[in-house]
Amino acid sequence: MFSGVVMAWQKAQGCLKESLSKDVYSLWIAPLESVRQENGVVSLAGPDRYFIAFVKQNYLKEIERSLTGVDSSITDVRFLEKKAVPQLRSMMHRTSTSAPTFPVPSVSSASTASTASTASSASSVPRQLRLPSVPKNNASIRALHPRYTFDEFMVGQSNILAESACRAISADADTVGPCLYINSGTGLGKSHLTHAVAHHLLSNSPMTRMHYVTAQQFSAEMVHGIKNNSMDMFKKKYQEDCDILLVEDIHTLKGKKKTQEELNEVLDTLVKSGKRVLLTANAAPRELAGIDGEFRSRMSAGLITSIQAPDIKTRSRIVERKAAGQRLSFDEDMTSYLAQNVRGDVRQIESAITAIGARARLMGGYIDMNLIREVVGSVVGCNQSLSSSLIRDLISAQFQVSVEDLQSRSRKKSISLPRQIAMYLSRKFTEESLAEIGRTYKRDHSTVIHSVKVITDKARRDMSLGAQVNLLSDKVKQI
């Protein structure tokens, strides 16, 4: 009996692997285990009831279609938690004909909480785990990284407000209001926190109607709705069938006026209805280029918080966590050296540790300070003696612009561009805060943020400027 259902499920999984994305398959299909097939009913076991509720809500039709496609005798699919599997298998090997009992939630209505009860099964097939009816809301949820949870997020002074706000909005607390906007550079935790909110809701409030998309996905879905004359369905999905909306990378909507108008309408409707909204971008609303004024105003109406690069204490904890995850053993001096010298984003820290692990394995598994210094020098290239004033002096010499001019209010391109490059390099290669870098040039922190964004964008579009910035980066590493 087990071999038959296992074979059918394996074939069905092969079909699902072809029809679903790799992430969706690995996160939501692969964990399901086939445990029984009898009288046309296949029983699949999932990790817990929240997982099962999400699978039933989003992928039940695909699962049923794939199973009936490989075995026409299959007429129904039922689910149970994996913790009930040993009991089921034990029961199946007994000679007793007495009907087994399984705990199932008692459901009085969709609006009342379920309570555990013990019910006798009328047949040898365990009753399907029942939950309060999950609304069929056509949820849009990006594939979630399994480790991007609140428990795995390393909290420090640079991100504590953003983390607290995300916990509050996921718990539907009134402390942050209905709309939360998070901005930061790449690799500092925006996506991690957004995934964490989604994970929390799936685990604790599986009936919450949640849509989690990137701004580009929202735009593509809107265009599809326009082309297929289905905008009514699109509007209903996001304005009516939604309790919380998560949208990443708002800055990618630059110049997309129609999408901005549509998303602004969605935000307005949701906020007025008391629903929750979480937006992320690489800059604060007022600093986003190519964004409509009304849309900018709507995004600015709630709590706005930024995530800065982690401080040395947080970096030390990140090093310890990432090293443990790769089964590497660092002593206190090694951890301290990495935390002091790898000053970029979390991805940069992880990259350095991965490189250390790879080189150690190639060299027989031995890790010492010489190896760590070599990796930091080649992969990261940071120098703890660097300061924004040293970089300012280097830029002054390279562009033949006086320090006084770099600190002046002049907007001449011959002065403003070197100043912006200097701020960009200071942010990249030093541990100084935005305010400290700003003081070096007699500016405030917002000017530094703007300069970093300008150089990042220009260097990506202008190959000549990109090469110049890379050359200057090499010179900074040699200071």
Curated annotation (Swiss-Prot):
The keyword Nucleotide-binding applies. GO terms for biological process: DNA replication initiation; regulation of DNA replication. One of its GO terms (cellular component) is cytoplasm. It is found in: Cytoplasm. Residues 143-360 are annotated as: Domain III, AAA+ region. Residues 361-479 are annotated as: Domain IV, binds dsDNA. Its main location: cytoplasm. GO terms for molecular function: ATP binding; ATP hydrolysis activity; DNA replication origin binding; lipid binding. ATP binds at residues 187, 189-191. Keywords: ATP-binding, Cytoplasm, DNA replication, DNA-binding, Lipid-binding, Nucleotide-binding. Belongs to the DnaA family. Oligomerizes as a right-handed, spiral filament on DNA at oriC. Plays an essential role in the initiation and regulation of chromosomal replication. ATP-DnaA binds to the origin of replication (oriC) to initiate formation of the DNA replication initiation complex once per cell cycle. Binds the DnaA box (a 9 base pair repeat at the origin) and separates the double-stranded (ds)DNA. Forms a right-handed helical filament on oriC DNA; dsDNA binds to the exterior of the filament while single-stranded (ss)DNA is stabiized in the filament's interior. This is Chromosomal replication initiator protein DnaA. It comes from Desulfotalea psychrophila (strain LSv54 / DSM 12343). The gene is dnaA.
